[in-house]
Amino acid sequence: RTSAATLARVLATMYSNPKFQGAIQGLPVGGVSGTLIHRFVKTAPQAVGLVQAKTGSINGVVSLAGFVDSGDRKYAFAIITDRLRHTYKIESAARATIDKLLGKIAAPMQIVTATDVAPSPSPEASAN
């Protein structure tokens, strides 16, 4: 058995090692590609394109592990639900809950422009 915390630490370590960049870049993107193409679209649309992760499931377990962008940061995460009753409805609800949780964290990077940093002085202000 592996804990979610251990899995998240492994992902964070991989992220900081250039040898693993190909594996990280190959992760499916929420609402965009792979096994996550239909995830987040209805459950947490604000997270579409901001979650890169791998799904996992066996009877009674639903999991998602990867990275979520939040502003100018990227967080490694691992969420593992366990001991679920093995029904489509319950496992779908677990996936939706995971999506909504990540939707609370996900945020696009804010682009700062020169006008956001310092407004131009008005001609009247520079004349005084």
Region annotations inferred by a language model:
Residues R1-N128:
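Small-residue-rich helix-loop
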